[in-house]
């Protein structure tokens, strides 16, 4: 089976600074923008799953499971 290589741009939860902050300071923090690359092995309305590796026996290694709400964009990477 053929799998698409994809770049996923997504937002992650972050804790930018340890320690106490005022409510005003806390409201200024934002989710961390991230990018991940992998083989698209599954997607549905709730989630997208990519794998770092796929073996000849179609076993996977290095999975990342993304909730759809965290994903900003998915781009197919063309390769030869």
Show which residues each predicted segment covers.
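Conserved RNA-binding domains used in RNP assembly and mRNA/RNA metabolism
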Residues: 2-80
């Amino acid at each position: 089976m053929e799998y698409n290589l994809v770049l996923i741009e997504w937002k992650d939860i972050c804790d930018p600074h340890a320690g106490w902050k005022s409510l005003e300071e806390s409201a200024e923090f934002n989710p961390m923008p991230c990018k991940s690359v992998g083989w698209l092995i599954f997607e549905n309305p709730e989630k997208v799953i990519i794998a770092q590796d796929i073996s000849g026996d179609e076993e996977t290694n290095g999975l990342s499971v993304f909730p759809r709400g965290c994903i900003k964009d998915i781009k197919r990477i063309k390769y030869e």
